[in-house]
Amino acid sequence: LVGSEMCIRDRGKAGRKKPVLFPKIVFLYDENIHGKGKISEDVFEAGVDCSAKTMYPDWLSMSGKGYISSMYKQYGKVISPMGCRAFLSPWYERGGMYPADDKDVPVFVGRFNIGAVSLHLPMILAKARAESRDFYEVLDFYLEMIRNLHIRTYDYLGQMRASTNPLAYCEGGFYGGHLKPNEKIGKILKPMTASFGITALNELQELYNGKSIAEDGQFALDVLKYCLLYTSPSP
């Protein structure tokens, strides 16, 4: 079935054969299933061929290294990407942001992101130079602006009544969504995330010293680490 889906997708639309982008497909690659000589190697090959023609499916490695694969290996949980290829951070059943103990498990199904606001990093560097200010001082201003926008969004959404979307908030469509129609939804928003977006790292590096991130990505990496530290919650 999956192989057939790949074949249908890479043919494109009738007529001009234009690639079909929606609905998006994500291929969950498991080396033990899709690797060389494994039972579904042919499905993997079909996926590669489809990606070469249409840029989809997106790929997630369940047997590699990193956040996505570690959650799969430890808990058997698949973290599906949202539309912009962003991923939900874990929320544990009993402990919330952090596991209560080694038996606590993360929840991803039924959760959502309330919104994303992206940093235009080259613009921030250009602004800092034009105003003769420290880059990180200007970056802090925009990071705090995004944080405040997200807080405002949480507060605004929290005042909405469950009756605005009964399927999601009253019938369990969203995680914790078993409210009465007249209840405010703020009480179930805590497991939901808000995103700080990052754009144009390569252009940032080129503006910084005229080199791409392939030639010298240190400044871009430093900025990324800085943003990650800023947005990381304290235990």
Feature map (PLM): residue ranges:
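Short acidic-hydrophobic sequence patches enriched in Asp/Glu that either
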Residues: 47, 138, 219, 223
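Conserved, charged catalytic cores of large soluble enzymes
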Residues: 4-5, 9-86
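Ordered core of a single globular domain
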Residues: 206-232
